[in-house]
Amino acid sequence: MNASGKAVIAFSVVGQDFFPSAGFASLDAVNGAGAIVISAPGALPDYGFTGYVPFGFRSARWGDYSRAVADESGAIWLGNEFIPNGPRDILANWGTFITMVNP
């Protein structure tokens, strides 16, 4: 939330029509939640190699790398996980997308 009371929530968008993508929605006390915005569309499925050992790697780690912070100008910066179409290593294919929003 910035000093004007405007907020943005960062999240992943995944579904039948979406590979893991970076998304956000604006929030404010007057209008409530805004529309979902895809800031970076995912290009590929999650390979699942970054699974949790206690679960036998059956459950891939996902969604624990989203962040939002307001700067002194009122802009809100977001960092989200998504699956880009680019270089990957042997254990993971996710990337980070940074978005600046002026709510």
Residue ranges and their predicted role:
Residues 1-103:
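C-terminal PAP-associated
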